[in-house]
């Protein structure tokens, strides 16, 4: 198991949930957390604990976003008009690494970030190497011609595990995707229940 995979599964174990719906997740085989004390019965969480866990799960899902960056995303979501939890999810799903993941160009959000950071992706014909780059509706995301060989190796895994949501149009033959619209929370295909309203409560304390 690679270091990246180990980190990903560590998040699953910490949350006690298979947050990406991966068949190989260790929580599919056990219902306790990591470490020698993981088998102890879990105590009931306080309101703060529930809110913290919701925040950790959401930011973990998007590749364990650093706290400073996640807080900045939340701050922007709260400044925008409309429902803050919906705004938060919309901003997270507008990230370039999230779109590359949703489009099935790579098997995990961790791989998506690395793929973008290594310069394999273009947005509207321009190479972008920042995973947190925010895409707008209508943006065209494509894998560089010289990088398409890297993607096809993972094709069987990608296509077997999840569908492309309807707010993204993807052509897997050309390795091109269009970000159609910013999704609502109900549109996002999370394998587990996400509770962004609890994230709002956490930061509003």
From Swiss-Prot:
Keywords of this entry: Ribonucleoprotein, Ribosomal protein, RNA-binding, rRNA-binding
Q: Recorded GO terms, molecular function? A: rRNA binding; structural constituent of ribosome
* Protein name from the UniProt record: Small ribosomal subunit protein uS4
The organism sits in which domain of life? Bacteria
Q: Which PROSITE patterns match?
A: RIBOSOMAL_S4, S4
GO cellular component terms listed in the entry, alphabetical order: small ribosomal subunit
Q: Which Pfam families match?
A: Ribosomal_S4, S4
Can you cite a GO biological process for this protein? translation
User: Where does the chain cross the membrane?
Assistant: none
Which Gene3D superfamilies does the record associate with it?
Answer: Ribosomal Protein S4 Delta 41, Chain A, domain 1 (1.10.1050.10), RNA-binding S4 domain (3.10.290.10)
What residue spans carry the Basic and acidic residues bias annotation?
Answer: 1-16
What taxonomic classification does the UniProt entry list for its organism?
Bacteria, Pseudomonadati, Pseudomonadota, Alphaproteobacteria, Hyphomicrobiales
Cite the CDD domains for this sequence. S4 (cd00165)
Hey, which family's this protein in? Belongs to the universal ribosomal protein uS4 family.
Annotated HAMAP family: Ribosomal_uS4_B
**Region (Disordered): which ranges?**
1-46
Summarize subunit and interaction data from the UniProt record for this chain. Answer: Part of the 30S ribosomal subunit. Contacts protein S5. The interaction surface between S4 and S5 is involved in control of translational fidelity.
Q: Where is the S4 RNA-binding domain?
A: 94-157
Role played:
One of the primary rRNA binding proteins, it binds directly to 16S rRNA where it nucleates assembly of the body of the 30S subunit. With S5 and S12 plays an important role in translational accuracy.
